[in-house]
């Protein structure tokens, strides 16, 4: 590279140190400032660079490490040369008392000349209120101020367009922006610290949507790290790891859905959820292609909601999305963030709600992501007894740090408000609540009161739920909580965690355990299939048959069942109909609706080819009918959370492997559910019924169209008050189909 022109010293002025062309000495302090600037350790580069009024005029200093020459271009077209001072810093005086609008004309050794705006002439893009709220950990719209935001500023020389980069790194010794725009060399783009709030900021003109970027962070430990933006709105597709500048331009069309949602009480509405892993439902589809195919499929099957396994960006596909590195960016595997908005919008327009799995319990150790972000344990807890998850070898958030809690609460709001998500299923809540979760004695630290409860996590969950419900009426916050923690779905003002629903893991484990026994032996395990009603109203429950039950050697739902192919299918049909009639909402993982034989594989996807076989096509037909009948039968959902919605008829027939109960609607409607988990039919069984008159069978899982044997009720069922039975004023003789479930409704006198 050709040497830059020497700085001339005016005649007659003694200057023992290097001088600029105006004769002002290059003091040791100024040299040290420039050295710190180039080294990336200057906390306020804007104090040195940019335009600053002085006695001689307006000083303009520019950092252009690779430039041959730099001139200031003024609004009147004149140019003022900025001589090179030291290590790529150019400086000179522009006549006048006030800072003018200007641009920099930068020439390089190859003759290239560029006219660019100066990043260091711009004021901070964060206001005092934003800084205060960040410092307090109370900025509920954190994504509006952190991350990368494209901006436009008017000026005499023409509007300036660029991107404001803002990142929280309170212990960093310096932060620079790197990306496509500077050939991934951050020397020319050091950021300024905004003080004790810990935020670093820089507006870079000329950087727009689609630009890849990262932060170079000089940690408190003296180590430079290249970090993805924790609040990036878009990313490169894995395995690449850069963040991407993205501005949403999506126009939503779901106002009607949002209005109805805000007025609804999901506890008193039908809610059947189809759980989906987007990458393997039909492998190879984009968000927009899924919007065409998935929407039609879910509507055909009649589910009220879908629940997506985590969509936030994650580097390892085999984690299924549960090891998140970019909490504010939908994965780039299937398209842009606006493409994902389109998928949600299409589902809403079809009357289908959207839940997301959300993972605040832990995050991976990837060195380019959140781990030791500023050279310290920033997002993670510094004590490994609280900061490392022993099951997954991941890091645990420091819930006691207000800024970290703010990051997570704002992230939940981001998905709910920016993507119109209808609720979040919070993953691994139990691992957050207990300090000794998966830890042996001596591997965990008690709380301040000597207990094992994680008090910081409890406070975080309460804040999360209270804030989410306050800002977004009609949503659902759902806990995957596998213990008997009290009050998970109780309101925060009465001491609860504030969730709207909780997965009923006990029902799932007990029911699957019962059904895996041969029918001959089920009589000895009858309590497993009845115990759920002992605590059914202790929380607001979702009954989950989720992805977790069909992986890691647990076998598919179909192959958990005993017997030959017909018996397995019959058992599974009975399970689903029993589940849909049991108090609580329902969740079914994709593939289970067609009785998939293999365990789920995120690489292979759903075994759609099985639908050519009658048993599998019949299972899908049954699920569609279950959802149709469920939505149209108030007794199955309007009193899910109160004991008045359920009455046992007979829960004690262990030897016959049968159950019978009533479900009541808030309008007085009633449904009788007859369950037979034995392999033989039970004809001419007397069952108690609340009303005398005609009863009609609306569902029989043993029907031929579902793949059953065709054992059904003998036409219209006449209930009579001549023989009160099972605590009911009337009764009738009915048939319990083999390995089947029958639903009866009152048809009138």
Curated annotation (Swiss-Prot):
Superkingdom of origin organism: Bacteria
SMART domains: Aamy
Reaction equations catalysed: Transfers a segment of a (1->4)-alpha-D-glucan chain to a primary hydroxy group in a similar glucan chain
Pathway the protein acts in: Glycan biosynthesis; glycogen biosynthesis
Residue positions of the active site: 427, 480
Gene Ontology process terms (BP): glycogen biosynthetic process
One GO MF term attached to the UniProt entry: hydrolase activity, hydrolyzing O-glycosyl compounds
Enzyme Commission number(s): 2.4.1.18
PANTHER family, per database record: 1,4-ALPHA-GLUCAN-BRANCHING ENZYME
Protein name: 1,4-alpha-glucan branching enzyme GlgB
Entry's family note: Belongs to the glycosyl hydrolase 13 family. GlgB subfamily.
């Amino acid at each position: 590279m050709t040497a830059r022109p020497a700085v001339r010293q005016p005649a007659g002025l003694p200057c023992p140190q290097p001088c600029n062309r105006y004769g002002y000495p290059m003091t040791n302090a100024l040299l040290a400032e420039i050295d710190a600037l180039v080294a990336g350790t200057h906390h306020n580069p804007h104090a040195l660079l940019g335009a600053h009024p002085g006695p001689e005029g307006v000083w303009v200093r520019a950092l252009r490490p690779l430039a041959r020459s730099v001139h200031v271009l003024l609004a009147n077209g004149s140019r003022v040369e900025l001589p090179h001072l030291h290590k790529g810093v150019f400086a000179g005086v522009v006549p006048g008392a006030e800072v003018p609008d200007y641009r920099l004309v930068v020439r390089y050794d190859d003759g290239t000349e560029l006219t660019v705006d100066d990043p260091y002439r711009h004021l901070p893009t964060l206001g005092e209120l934003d800084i205060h709220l960040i410092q307090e950990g109370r900025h509920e719209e954190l994504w509006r101020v952190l991350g990368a935001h494209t901006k436009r500023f008017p000026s005499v020389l023409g509007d300036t367009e660029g991107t404001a980069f803002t990142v929280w790194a309170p212990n960093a010794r310096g932060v620079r922006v790197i990306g496509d725009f500077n050939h991934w060399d951050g020397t020319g783009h050091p950021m300024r610290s905004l003080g004790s709030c810990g935020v670093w900021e820089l507006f870079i003109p000329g950087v727009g949507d689609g630009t890849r970027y990262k932060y170079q962070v000089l940690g408190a430990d003296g180590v430079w790290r290249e970090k993805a933006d924790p609040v990036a709105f878009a990313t490169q597709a894995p395995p690449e790891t850069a963040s991407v500048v993205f501005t949403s331009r999506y126009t939503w069309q779901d106002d009607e859905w949002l209005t109805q949602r805000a007025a609804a009480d999901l506890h008193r509405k039908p809610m059947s959820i189809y759980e989906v892993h987007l990458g393997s439902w039909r492998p190879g589809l984009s968000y927009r292609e899924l919007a065409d195919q998935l929407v039609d499929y879910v509507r055909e099957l009649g589910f009220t909601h879908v629940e997506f396994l985590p969509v936030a960006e994650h580097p390892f596909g085999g984690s299924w999305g549960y090891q998140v590195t970019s909490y504010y960016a939908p994965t780039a595997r299937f398209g842009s963030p606006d493409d994902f908005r389109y998928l949600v919008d299409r589902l809403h327009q079809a009357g289908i709600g959207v839940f997301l799995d959300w993972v605040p319990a832990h995050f991976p150790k990837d060195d380019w992501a959140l781990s030791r972000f500023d050279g310290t344990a920033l997002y993670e807890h510094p004590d490994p007894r609280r900061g490392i998850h022993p099951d997954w070898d991941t890091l645990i958030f420091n819930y006691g740090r207000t800024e970290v809690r703010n990051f997570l609460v704002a992230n939940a709001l981001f998905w709910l408000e920016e993507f119109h998500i209808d609720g979040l299923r919070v993953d691994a809540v139990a691992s957050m609540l207990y300090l000794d979760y998966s830890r042996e004695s001596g591997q965990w630290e008690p709380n301040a009161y000597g207990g094992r409860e994680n008090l910081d996590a409890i406070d975080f969950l309460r804040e999360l739920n209270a804030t989410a419900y306050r800002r977004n009426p009609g949503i659902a916050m759902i806990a995957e909580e596998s213990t008997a923690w009290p009050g998970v779905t109780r309101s925060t003002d009465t001491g609860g965690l504030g969730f709207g629903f909780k997965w009923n893991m006990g029902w799932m484990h007990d029911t699957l355990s019962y059904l895996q026994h041969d029918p001959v032996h089920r009589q000895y395990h009858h309590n497993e299939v009845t115990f759920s009603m002992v605590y059914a109203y202790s929380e607001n429950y979702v009954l989950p048959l989720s992805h977790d039950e069909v992986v890691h050697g647990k076998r598919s739902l179909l192959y958990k069942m005993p017997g030959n192919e017909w018996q397995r299918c019959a058992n599974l049909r009975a399970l689903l109909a029993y589940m849909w009639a049991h108090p609580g909402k329902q969740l079914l993982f994709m593939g289970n609706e067609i009785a998939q034989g293999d365990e789920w594989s995120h690489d292979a996807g759903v075994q759609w080819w099985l639908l050519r076989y009658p048993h599998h096509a019949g299972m899908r037909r049954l699920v569609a009918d279950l959802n149709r009948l469920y939505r149209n039968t108030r007794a199955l959902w309007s009193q899910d959370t109160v004991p008045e919605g359920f009455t046992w008829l007979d829960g004690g027939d262990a030897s016959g492997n049968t159950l019978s109960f009533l479900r009541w609607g808030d309008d007085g409607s009633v449904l009788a559910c007859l369950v037979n988990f034995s392999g033989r039919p039970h004809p001419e069984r007397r069952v108690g019924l609340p009303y005398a008159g005609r009863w009609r069978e609306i569902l029989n899982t043993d029907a031929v169209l579902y793949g059953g044997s065709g054992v059904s009720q003998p036409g219209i069922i006449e209930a009579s008050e001549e023989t009160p039975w099972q605590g009911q004023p009337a009764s009738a003789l009915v048939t319990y189909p083999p390995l089947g479930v029958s639903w009866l409704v009152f048809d009138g006198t």
